[in-house]
């Protein structure tokens, strides 16, 4: 009998965005993307939620970071 590939009752770990007052000083804004900044060679999205920014995990491509930001906006229905 073969073993199942993944553990059945394992909890799914989801990313909880860090809250920051602003993107860090050394982050470089990517002009072609609304929420994407370059940080230590990776792409990070910062989405303004009320008084603070939510920070995405680091991505290797800016499109992924922007997609994350769009999803966060949709989930929280942020209106401009």
Swiss-Prot record:
Belongs to the CedA family. Pfam families: CedA. It comes from the Bacteria. Keywords: Cell cycle, Cell division, DNA-binding. GO terms for biological process: cell division. Activates the cell division inhibited by chromosomal DNA over-replication. InterPro entries: CedA-like_sf (IPR038463), Cell_div_activator_CedA (IPR019666). Coiled coil: none annotated. The lineage of its organism: Bacteria, Pseudomonadati, Pseudomonadota, Gammaproteobacteria, Enterobacterales. This is Cell division activator CedA. GO terms for molecular function: DNA binding.
